[in-house]
UniProtKB/Swiss-Prot annotation:
Keyword terms, alphabetized: ANK repeat, Cell membrane, Endoplasmic reticulum, Lead, Lipid-binding, Membrane, Metal-binding, Peroxisome, Repeat, Signal-anchor, Transmembrane, Transmembrane helix, Transport
Main location: membrane
Subunit structure, as described in the record: Interacts (via ankyrin repeats) with HIPP26 and the ethylene-responsive element-binding proteins RAP2-3/EBP and RAP2-12. Interacts with CSE.
Name of the protein in its database record: Acyl-CoA-binding domain-containing protein 2
Source species taxonomy: Eukaryota, Viridiplantae, Streptophyta, Embryophyta, Tracheophyta
Organism: Arabidopsis thaliana (Mouse-ear cress)
Domain of life: Eukaryota
Length: 354
């Protein structure tokens, strides 16, 4: 009886082992078959699954010569092999683009460093203002993209010019902006690369951050920093008019400082008072015989300023003081031309003048 029990047990174990072995073989066969089939991810492109034991470099080759199992794979997948090769080429192109982009970034950084170093050098050639503005616009596009900053006041000439240079470039690609920036620098300084490398080894970030001079703060923001820009030089009397300091203003005039003294932009204290909206200062200056028709370097009078800044009370005061409503600036515009507000009195004044 005991022998029969052992025999039955052996048979059962044998059956179990046979079942497991058959299952294992089935899994292996299924796995191999899966390796030879094409799978597709719902959100990704076709993937080429290669069978075990086949050299992947051979499957990626554009040549023939596949045998046996490899030939069967190509027949099943159709054009998937060519897609895979195209994908590999695309990845290689991306790699090259990355290298080119890095080289362009480095060249652009070297160019900007050279420009800031040249700007700090007073012996360097003077760059025309229109070129400065163009460089500024290209720099902003390359580093920040399209202009989204609000338009500065018309009275902030430098800031407005920079904003316009940036804004007119629209959605120019940063890479194109970098290339054009480098091109302009090369036109200005054909040997800039040698100088740029030397400057980089000497100055570094300090040279860039402290640069001022002919180029001005070319890479600064649009904030019009009147106290730090070397482009604008004002005397104390202009500062008092700008800040509305009546007592100090009167002391300056009484000490002999001309009431129509001009700053580096041709502005008088009256221009500054109106720019900041100080009607009381304007009245003090006019009382001290300030010229209500004085023109700055752009040909604009205090009335131009009042109209552009939409300061009706000051504009009306100036007109009553015989300010010329028809005075033309360098662009050929009079205060009347620039007036966008509905001020009947300024129209009536212009008619009376005619």
């Amino acid at each position: 009886m005991g022998d029969w029990a052992q025999l039955a047990q052996s048979v059962i174990l044998g059956l179990i082992f046979s079942y497991l072995l058959a299952k294992l073989i089935s899994i292996v066969v299924t796995f191999k078959e899966d390796n030879l089939s094409l799978t597709r991810h719902p959100e990704e492109s076709q993937l080429e699954i290669k069978p075990e034991g086949v050299d992947s470099r051979r499957l990626d080759s554009s040549c023939g010569g596949f045998g046996g199992e490899a030939d069967s794979l190509v027949a099943e997948q159709g054009s998937s092999r060519s897609d895979s090769v195209a994908g590999d080429d695309s990845e290689e192109d991306d790699d090259w683009e990355g290298v080119e982009s890095t080289e362009l970034d480095e060249a652009f950084s070297a160019a900007t460093l050279f420009v800031t170093t040249a700007a700090a050098d007073r012996l360097s050639q003077k760059v025309p203002s229109d070129v400065q503005q163009q460089l500024y616009g290209l720099y902003k596009i390359a580093t920040e993209g399209p202009c989204t900053a609000p338009q500065p006041s018309a009275l902030k000439m430098t800031a407005r010019a920079k904003w316009q240079a940036w804004q007119k470039l629209g959605a120019m690609p940063p890479e194109e902006a970098m290339e054009k920036y480098i091109e302009i620098v090369t036109q200005l300084y054909p040997t800039w690369l040698d100088g740029g490398v030397k400057a980089g080894s000497r100055g570094g970030d300090d040279a860039a951050s402290n640069s001022r001079g002919t180029m001005g703060p070319v890479f600064s923001s649009l904030v019009y920093d009147e106290e730090s820009e070397n482009e604008l030089k004002i005397d104390a009397i202009h500062g008092f008019a700008r800040e509305g300091e009546v007592e100090n203003l009167l002391k300056s005039i009484e000490s002999g400082i001309p009431v129509n003294a001009r700053d580096s932009e041709g502005r008088t204290p009256l221009h500054w008072a109106i720019d900041r909206g100080h009607l009381n200062i304007a009245k003090v200056l006019v009382d001290k015989n300030a010229d209500v028709n004085a023109k700055d370097n752009e040909g604009q009078t205090p009335l131009h300023y009042a109209v552009v800044c939409d300061r009706e009370a000051i504009a009306e005061f100036l007109v009553k003081q015989n300010a010329n409503t028809a005075a033309k600036d360098e662009d050929g515009n009079s205060p009347l031309d620039l007036c966008e507000s509905d001020w009947p009195w300024i129209r009536d004044s212009a008619k009376q003048a005619d």
